[in-house]
């Protein structure tokens, strides 16, 4: 009486492993891009929120604040970006000092796992002009 052997051969197992490897190679870049895109929302939401707080500050004080702590601090809520505030109304690339400020530029710089993102830095100024810098992508892609 012959016994039938049940199970998988080594060849069948290797084919399954190869198929899984191909699927992983195709899926991982899409997954990474999706995660990066969702983390970018952290920067965009924080910039928009800080800009709104700047406008509120301006309405109450007739000047924008030059202290990021008045807007919520240097870390974005989810911690993927470091926020900074730069006041340079005369465009001489040095921070303005004095009492009354009529311009501002907010910057969100990627940190930690997000630092390798192709849209690494986002900016927003008092007129609502959005900017970005990084290794690739377009303004529409990043924003």
Regions found by a protein language model. Name each.
Residues 45, 49, 124-127:
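Hydrophobic alpha-helical segments of small multi-pass membrane proteins
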Residues 37-38, 48-70:
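Alpha-helix exit/C-cap motif
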Residues 2-31:
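N-terminal single-pass transmembrane signal-anchor helix
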Residues 59-143:
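Periplasmic/extracellular, small/polar-rich flexible segments of pilin-like filament-forming proteins
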Residues 35-43:
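Juxtamembrane interface helices immediately C-terminal to a transmembrane segment
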Residues 16, 34, 109:
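Detector for the N-terminal beta1/A-loop initiation region of ABC nucleotide-binding domains
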